[in-house]
Structure formats: structure tokens, C-alpha cells
Amino acid sequence: MGKDTIADIITSIRNADMNRKGTVRIGSTNITESIVKILLREGFIENVRKHRENNQYFLILTLRHRRNKKESYKTILNLKRISRPGLRIYSNSQRIPRILGGIGIVILSTSRGIMTDREARLKRVGGEILCYIW
């Protein structure tokens, strides 16, 4: 049985957000780094640091905060894994779904790398739908 690294990072971020943790530590691979870059660029996370411990690299993510009058609280971050090792989901560029009318993003793995739904539509490429984030 294989390990699903994308589901692991989605679960880690979701659990940290629900437990009101400020930071998340995930293992660093090429796939996780490209997904984290997209999350940082789209504003879902605040900061990313690369940390080395015992010849292993980790990414330390700082989650974004919202301010309230009484106290600061975390944003409610919704992440959902779509394509998984047992059931791969593919889409062409015309049929890439829109999440909440364009408010959320879809992360795709294409022949040109991992990108958001907007970038894939502009480049007119389809691919495997990895996850939804809203």
C-alpha cells in the first residue's frame, strides 16, 4: 500500500486549522513544495520556511489569521482531496470545475507542472484534479 503525500499535507493543514495551531510541519518533496507555493501565492497561508533536521527537509507553514474585535482567530480553510491513488480524476481544459464561482481554487497536475485552475485555463491544458481549496 502506497503513501498519499498530498492527502497527508491536506489533512495536516486541515487539522492544524481546526485546532487553532499557528504552524504546520510537513515533509518536503517536489510535489508538496509546488502545492505550498500555490497556497502561498493565492493567500491561503502566510509564510513558508524550509527546515533541515537529521538530513531530512521539512516545510514549516504559518497559517493565515483573521482579526476579530475581541480576539484573533484563524481563517476557516476548507481543503478536499479529489483524485486519489485508487480513483484518479482527470479533466480537460474546458471542463475544469469552478469552486464557489471562482472564489476557491482547483489544484491540477498537468504536463506543464502543478498549477491552479485559472493558470490551466489560460494555458489551455488539462490534467489530474488533485484537490479543491476554498
Curated annotation (Swiss-Prot):
Q: Which Gene3D superfamilies match?
A: 3.30.1370.30, 3.30.1490.10
GO terms in the biological process aspect are:
translation
Give the chief site where it resides. Answer: plastid
Q: Which GO terms fall under molecular function for this chain's record?
A: rRNA binding; structural constituent of ribosome
Q: Which SUPFAM superfamilies does the record match to this protein? A: Ribosomal protein S8
Pfam families, alphabetically?
A: Ribosomal_S8 (PF00410)
Alphabetized, the UniProt keywords read: Chloroplast, Plastid, Ribonucleoprotein, Ribosomal protein, RNA-binding, rRNA-binding
Compartment(s) where it occurs, according to its Swiss-Prot or TrEMBL record = Plastid, Chloroplast
Is Plastid set as a keyword in this record? yes
Q: Which top-rank group of organisms is this from? A: Eukaryota
Which InterPro entries does UniProt cross-reference here?
Ribosomal_uS8, Ribosomal_uS8_CS, Ribosomal_uS8_sf
What does UniProt give as GO cellular component? chloroplast; ribonucleoprotein complex; ribosome
Q: How does it assemble?
A: Part of the 30S ribosomal subunit.
Q: What does this protein do?
A: One of the primary rRNA binding proteins, it binds directly to 16S rRNA central domain where it helps coordinate assembly of the platform of the 30S subunit.
Report the family membership. Belongs to the universal ribosomal protein uS8 family.
Q: What is this protein called?
A: Small ribosomal subunit protein uS8c
In its UniProt entry, the species of origin is given as Aethionema cordifolium (Lebanon stonecress)
Please spell out the taxonomic lineage of the organism that makes this protein: Eukaryota, Viridiplantae, Streptophyta, Embryophyta, Tracheophyta
Gene it is expressed from: rps8
